[in-house]
Regions:
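Active-site/ligand-binding-proximal alpha/beta "capping" segment
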Residues: 221-295, 381-387
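N-terminal juxtadomain amphipathic helix
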Residues: 1-81
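Active-site/ligand-binding loops adjacent to catalytic centers
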Residues: 209, 213-233, 238, 294-395
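Positively charged, low-complexity intrinsically disordered leader regions
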Residues: 57-145
Length: 428
């Protein structure tokens, strides 16, 4: 891309400094060396993996002591638990024996499922947002925030009407930080989700398409206008706030560091042949892959979209005309643009018309010799039913779309392969 760098100690930098005006074709990435994962035995991933998180390095650069940084995590986690009913905890991950049998895998292979459905706000999304909140709060604690008091805080902003909005509003409520949530017209948004957003004190802004809007999601347009006006991008899109790519890696670290089922905790670790990860905006897949890569593991990554909206798969194919997936970022406009028209799917949480974090996802698939998978709707529906029937996990069709990708290409896999998926969000 443009080659700009940002020092880890620079406060409140969310985007590439060269992403000015309407030029959104920029993306920051976290630069960190591969290192053996040696988490502590704390059951909170933001404490267990704290020394690997970029926010911790940032807070240390501001002069906060190790004890102060740990205290910030514990305090915020307690506040989140008071609102959500749970704080951040390492989530279950293991072989789904009945599901593996149903899909014809041998005892040596099978499907391992990471269950995020009982996490904060019922999905993985809060993991991404928590490191943004940690960045904000540590900036305040260090006396580096440009606002003088909590009452003068700028509002948070997010464009979402689903799990990300719920996660963002939950974290905002925990610290009494004002938040604006940009949602599609009420006919397109879940009444239950909207009701919960209001309960959490969010300022919900409906965003019908305006005649002057360019292509793309009107909610994202209004969100960006709010950020231009001074709001903090409390977003799960790395192109809007790169700090969301920090906390999301904890999922990959938990999976990459998991011990074999027949070993004592801490003895060895599982190795996987493939990861199937559902993709909407792309940060989730980028983070899971980054977590594995930093741990020194590169199973084949398959980013899964539906045939109703598959801009990432299109970008993958287009990339081979401009030098391949790892060079595609220099040809943004030729590879990634809004998908039109966006169809319908039960997996409505991955119908983003753009895969905003497409560059790291393409690179991760290329590095691991993976490829995108476009799932048909019958596989989307089958996946949700299969997972619930064979594991009891009550995930939404969005949350089981990775399994739908596996179903789509099951006949191409050997029966002894080890496959990992993430049940990323609860059925509502």
């Amino acid at each position: 891309m443009c080659g700009a760098t940002v020092d880890i100690a620079e406060p409140l930098v969310w985007r590439c400094p060269n992403a000015l005006g309407d030029d959104g074709h920029h993306a920051l990435e976290l630069v960190q060396a591969t290192a053996p994962l040696r988490p502590t035995d704390d059951d909170n991933p933001f404490l267990a993996f704290r020394r690997y998180l970029a926010w911790d390095s940032y807070a240390a650069a501001l002069g906060l002591t190790d004890a102060a940084r740990e205290a910030i995590v514990r305090d915020l986690d307690a506040r989140v638990a008071a609102v959500a009913g749970t704080g951040f905890r390492i989530t279950p991950f293991g072989r789904a024996d009945a599901l593996s049998d149903a899909l014809g895998f041998t005892a040596d292979g099978g499907v391992w499922v990471k269950d995020e459905t009982h996490g904060v706000a019922g999905s993985h999304k809060a993991r991404h947002l928590f490191t943004i909140l940690l960045h904000l709060v540590s900036t305040e604690v260090a006396g580096r925030a440009p606002w003088a008091s909590p009452e003068a805080r700028p509002p948070l902003a997010i464009a979402s009407c689903g799990n990300a909005a719920l996660a963002a509003s939950t974290l905002a409520a925990a610290v009494q930080w004002p938040i604006r949530v940009f949602v599609p017209p009420s006919t397109s948004a879940s009444a239950a989700v909207l009701a919960r957003l209001h309960e959490l004190g969010a300022h919900v802004v409906e965003c019908p398409r305006m005649s002057t809007d360019p292509p793309g999601d009107p909610c994202v347009h209004r969100f960006r206008e709010a950020v231009t006006g001074g709001a903090v991008p409390f977003s799960v899109q790395g192109t809007e706030n790169a700090w969301c790519l920090d906390g999301g890696r904890t999922i990959g670290w938990e999976m990459a560091g998991a011990p074999p089922d027949d070993a004592d905790q801490g003895v060895g670790r599982l190795s996987f042949d493939r990861l199937f990860v559902q993709v909407g905006g792309g940060a989730f897949a980028a983070c899971v892959a980054a977590g594995f890569r930093m741990a020194g593991a590169t199973p084949r990554l398959h980013a899964v979209q539906t045939d109703s909206c598959a801009p990432l798969a299109r970008a993958w194919e287009r990339s081979f005309a401009v030098g391949g997936p790892t060079a595609a970022g220099r040809h943004w406009g030729e590879c990634m643009w809004p998908w039109e028209p966006v169809g319908t799917s039960a997996a409505d949480g991955i119908l983003d018309d753009e895969t905003y974090d497409w560059i790291p996802v393409l690179a991760a698939m290329a590095e691991s010799h993976g490829a995108p998978v476009v799932a048909h709707e019958h596989h989307i529906l089958d996946a949700a039913a299969l997972l619930h029937r064979h594991t009891g996990i009550d995930a939404s069709p969005t949350g089981t779309a990775g399994l739908a990708g596996l179903l789509t290409v099951r006949d191409q896999l050997a029966s002894g392969e080890r496959v990992a998926i993430v049940a990323s969000g609860i059925r509502r």
